């Protein structure tokens, strides 16, 4: 069976105020085309299809239309993330085709979704875990009357023990199909970017990778165990290192922060019954103990409507580089001149039509001693002039002093 793993669509999110509708449309077309050309039989979406719990109507329609089109050509399994509203997302399952399953209920953790292969392909077992907010689920997942510890580790351990119990039963009955877990969490060893919302609770924001290997510390973990863990939450595509089980973040399909520059995006393709002649050229075979047929993992690049470019330098150097940058790129510029250049923003926007962030950060900022002053006798005009002089790296001009006088006079007038 050939599976595509994606996550963190965040439909409705912008980048420095820039609407990303064209990027969303490009991703949607790419996803449909990839499912068709790569013969994808199951799409896993590991949380955060929306950026907000109550998304705008336009983004609801975009996601629903894309899911409807996907469901006409393949199976889709979707879980909720920390940005989604699990309750609202769960309601959509009543309006979608039978090929789509939306998994948001904590009570359903440990129930495998079974997908059958064709021919001698046995198919796959998928265990979806929606985003687990410790305060909301530590009583539900507790095996007794006492709530679990208030941490992501504790609730994920409990979820994995439920999955382990079901998988042990299946293994004892001779079911050796590959087993995949979907989760939305921050795993130890992963590298975050600036665009993820902090999910720290009780000082323990992360989950150990060993949780997926030993099923939450179960001394009698099922054998064979998991074949793959399809993660969501972090926006950079990455592999969790030193794990016995393949654990991957697909990353978001669209870049939502300049910390993700250059913004290269991808999805993961999992072949649970790989045939050499059908594998992608760079596919990686993964041997899973107890499963006769190795998995094959590969990535497929997602096109970008607007590559991200981050540039730092003097005003002259930045203006000189403009011709080398694709005019469709979204650009972050940091100007390092000691003095703020005249008309800095307007000149840079003329050179870079999609400059979304322009910052003046002098390369040589003098260290200033803490001022000693008498607040009662301090002159507001001279204080403001001193401040702007220090920040701009040069004395204020007569024109700027005139603006300061006007502002101070207006404020005093309004306060009378």
For the regions a language model picked out, list residue spans one by one.
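Short, surface-exposed connector motifs at secondary-structure boundaries
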Residues: 70-78, 327-330
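A conserved active-site cap/scaffold subdomain adjacent to cofactor or substrate pockets
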Residues: 216-217, 223, 228-302
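Conserved beta-strand elements of the Class I
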Residues: 4, 125-127, 266-268, 309, ...
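N-terminal active-site segment of His-dependent metallophosphoesterases
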Residues: 1-72, 406-410, 414-415
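His/Asp/Glu-rich metal-coordinating catalytic cores
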Residues: 55, 64, 77-246
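Divalent metal-coordination and catalytic microenvironments
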Residues: 8, 28, 48, 63, ...
């Amino acid at each position: 069976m050939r599976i595509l793993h994606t996550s963190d669509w965040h439909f409705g999110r912008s980048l420095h105020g820039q609407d990303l509708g064209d990027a969303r449309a490009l991703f949607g077309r790419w996803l449909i085309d990839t499912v068709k050309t790569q013969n994808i039989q199951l799409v896993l979406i590991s949380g955060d299809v929306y950026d907000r719990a109550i998304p705008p109507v336009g983004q609801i329609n975009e996601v629903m239309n894309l899911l409807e089109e996907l469901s006409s050509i393949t199976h889709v399994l979707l879980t909720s993330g920390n940005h989604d509203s699990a309750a609202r997302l769960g309601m959509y399952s009543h309006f979608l085709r039978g090929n789509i399953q939306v998994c948001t209920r904590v009570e359903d953790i440990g129930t495998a979704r079974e997908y059958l292969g064709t021919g001698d392909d046995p198919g796959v077992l998928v265990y979806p875990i929606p985003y687990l907010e410790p305060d909301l689920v530590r009583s539900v997942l507790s095996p007794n009357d006492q709530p679990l510890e208030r941490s992501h580790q504790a609730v994920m351990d409990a979820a994995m023990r439920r999955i382990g119990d079901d998988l042990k039963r299946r293994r004892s009955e001779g079911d050796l199909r590959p087993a995949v877990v979907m989760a939305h969490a921050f795993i130890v060893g992963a590298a975050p970017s600036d665009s993820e919302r902090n999910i720290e609770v009780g000082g323990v924001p992360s989950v150990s990778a060993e949780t997926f290997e030993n099923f939450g510390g179960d001394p009698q973990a099922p054998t064979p165990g998991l074949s793959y863990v399809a993660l969501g939450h972090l926006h950079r595509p990455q592999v969790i290192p030193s794990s016995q089980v393949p654990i991957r973040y697909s990353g978001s399909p669209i870049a939502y922060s300049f910390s993700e520059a250059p913004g290269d995006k991808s999805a993961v393709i999992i072949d649970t019954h790989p045939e050499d002649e059908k594998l992608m050229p760079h596919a990686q075979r993964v041997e899973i103990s107890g499963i006769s047929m190795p998995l094959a993992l590969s990535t497929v690049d997602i096109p970008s409507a607007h590559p991200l470019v981050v540039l730092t330098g003097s005003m002259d150097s930045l203006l000189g580089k403009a011709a080398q940058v694709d005019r469709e790129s979204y650009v972050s510029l940091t100007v390092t001149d000691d003095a703020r250049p005249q008309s800095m923003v307007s000149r840079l926007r003329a050179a870079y039509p999609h400059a979304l962030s322009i910052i003046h950060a002098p390369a040589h900022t003098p260290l200033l001693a803490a001022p000693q002053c008498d607040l009662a006798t301090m002159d507001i005009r001279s204080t403001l002039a001193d401040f702007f002089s220090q920040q701009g790296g040069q004395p204020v001009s007569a024109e700027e002093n005139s603006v300061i006088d006007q502002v101070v006079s207006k404020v005093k007038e309004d306060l009378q």
